[in-house]
Amino acid sequence: MMNEKILIVDDQYGIRILLNEVFNKEGYQTFQAANGLQALDIVTKERPDLVLLDMKIPGMDGIEILKRMKVIDENIRVIIMTAYGELDMIQESKELGALTHFAKPFDIDEIRDAVKKYLPLKSN
């Protein structure tokens, strides 16, 4: 049985590795993208169930990535991560369908709990 898929989108390698490890251990199948084009490619090919999306990414920003993801898969679940109180971006992303947001530096347990809430692992 295939595990639920999570895509981690962040230009910071350390954060991708950390989240990747945490959710792999939890039993999710994880994918990583460092930028918008990679992220959209993975969304198209792998159809992840949930995306952890950093809003501050060079090139295509988080809002643009979120908009394009929703075009590919309107039901995709997205949790956004922001570096600081970017209230406009948070508001806009929620209007675009983001489930919730976390400010960096985030508490890893809070993100883990949110992912489990929005994407419960199906028991085998």
From Swiss-Prot:
Signal sequence residues: none
Q: Which GO terms describe its cellular component?
A: cytoplasm
The Response regulatory domain sits at 5-119
Carrying 4-aspartylphosphate, the residues are: 54
Recorded GO molecular functions are: kinase activity; metal ion binding
Cofactor binding note of this UniProt entry: Binds 1 Mg(2+) ion per subunit.
Record-listed E.C. numbers: 2.7.-.-
Q: Which cofactor does it need?
A: Mg(2+)
Keywords, in A-Z order: Cytoplasm, Kinase, Magnesium, Metal-binding, Phosphoprotein, Sporulation, Transferase, Two-component regulatory system
The first-level EC class reads transferase
Q: Any idea what job this protein has?
A: Key element in the phosphorelay regulating sporulation initiation. Phosphorylation of spo0B during sporulation initiation.
| Protein name as annotated | Sporulation initiation phosphotransferase F
Organism listed in the record: Bacillus subtilis (strain 168)
